[in-house]
């Protein structure tokens, strides 16, 4: 595959430039985005969180065939607790191939890129949780602290924190020590597989900025490697903090390799999907050995977190029988079918301690899957959902005992009045491990608009304490999302996450809102566009009726025209009020000076005049 065959979107967003903030060592260079505003406006550039990696830096030459820079490689090796090894051989079944079939897509050249898998040395635990518990502040933790702060120290004086955080512990300033302490408590995770050195460190936790995840992936009937890599780049361009590859078709291994090697954000997967492909889609033929081999395969590639549906227990399955929509999780339904076919307990549950040891060797995080999440608002908060959540709490403590990082997945479809209870129960049962929810959708009547029905719930659950929101696209329940659906989903969820941060009173969250509001009131149209979550869409909507460049200077838009613009009228009222205030002040001075039309010149002034010649 070459850059000519794989079209990747590059270049900065409108009005923006990439900057880097250096930490305590030269190789800790934290990428951010600065939005420059109109010269002469008196406005400083607005600094915003950036997930786009080298793709928006014009000074970087990205070669997809070699992957993006390995930012963390030296940090990982210098700790001395991992070792290179040969790794498992790439097998035809990894890509869904039958014996004798050849792969039909390009394969990333790992050997040419100098890549060999890493794993823990015997007796070592190379996880961010283990380091945090030992009191070690890693370069990754320092990177995260700088990234979360941006210009917080300068901004906090200008913005009052007036939100409701429901018992969170959001600091005025994020320090590396605070990051370490939150990870050590299990309240935050820093997804960072030792085999994904390309990923820029980020953190997920309720005391940090609310994050979003974008799902991509092929299916048995649609998409290609090219499309999925571009979807990843596209998703991070618009603000995805992590990306999950949910591929279910052929060439899963090859597609994932291209994605990971070129991803600046953590990558998650659901390993049971690939394991199922290896047994021709027959859930009853799954075995622990096949699943374990799949975990190793993906950990060696560099997957940062796995969704593991270990909470779908045999005793919970009958609780779903009277549901409106049964079991809607793909992973949950696969494991439920296996349990019923064998009348045995879920092998992900019975082998959980072994999974912990395996994940610890690579610092792969757990995303404990909600296989029994409600798929309709009629099923929200039922016994099956909360029974599984209780088991996830049990498994969280087991994973922590192995120094594994954990996040907890949540619903789903939940009406607004039932959302808060989900967060409260998750915090109670799972020891404040970060919550990661799919929406939730607050109504079931809007196919084609489920990015909106879910963003309503996402904003609410984020406010209540969910740490990461999994996006929903307009194609949810209808089909595989394309590139534009990904953009729509990401931007919609950035909006929901930001709304949650505002409501929580997150320091500095309102700076961008205030800057855009001032630009709007002052008719600085380009600043409005550039400060928005989707500058290109904002510009396109404006230019639909007023495309001329001069319209970017006009004090009106096509909605109200020049005579009915409320902001223009408001400015005129303000100017009139200022003039009236000035007149009132002059009137008061006139009265205070004696209300005389003509004033007699003071005697001292007359004496000071020179005599006439």
From Swiss-Prot:
One GO MF term: 4 iron, 4 sulfur cluster binding
Cofactor comment: Binds 1 [4Fe-4S] cluster per subunit. The cluster is coordinated with 3 cysteines and an exchangeable S-adenosyl-L-methionine.
Gene3D superfamilies linked to this entry: 6.10.250.620, Radical SAM ThiC family, central domain
Binding residues annotated for substrate, in chain numbering: 215, 244, 273, 309, 329-331, 370-373, 409, 436
Gene Ontology terms: cellular component: cytosol
EC numbers on record: 4.1.99.17
Cofactor(s) the protein requires to work: [4Fe-4S] cluster
Keyword Iron-sulfur among UniProt keywords: yes
This protein's pathway: Cofactor biosynthesis; thiamine diphosphate biosynthesis
Top-level taxon in the UniProt lineage: Bacteria
Enzyme class, broadest EC rank: lyase
Pfam families in the record: ThiC-associated, ThiC_Rad_SAM
Catalytic reactions of this protein: 5-amino-1-(5-phospho-beta-D-ribosyl)imidazole + S-adenosyl-L-methionine = 4-amino-2-methyl-5-(phosphooxymethyl)pyrimidine + CO + 5'-deoxyadenosine + formate + L-methionine + 3 H(+)
UniProt-annotated binding residues for [4Fe-4S] cluster: 557, 560, 565
InterPro entries: ThiC, ThiC-associated_dom, ThiC/Bza_core_dom, ThiC/BzaA/B
Keyword Ribosomal protein: no
Entry binding sites for Zn(2+): 413, 477
GO BP terms in the entry: thiamine biosynthetic process; thiamine diphosphate biosynthetic process
Keyword annotations from UniProtKB, A to Z: 4Fe-4S, Iron, Iron-sulfur, Lyase, Metal-binding, S-adenosyl-L-methionine, Thiamine biosynthesis, Zinc
Entry-linked HAMAP family: ThiC
Family: Belongs to the ThiC family.
Record function comment: Catalyzes the synthesis of the hydroxymethylpyrimidine phosphate (HMP-P) moiety of thiamine from aminoimidazole ribotide (AIR) in a radical S-adenosyl-L-methionine (SAM)-dependent reaction.
Assembly with partners or alone: Homodimer.
Protein name from the UniProt record: Phosphomethylpyrimidine synthase
Organism: Paramagnetospirillum magneticum (strain ATCC 700264 / AMB-1)
The gene coding this protein: thiC
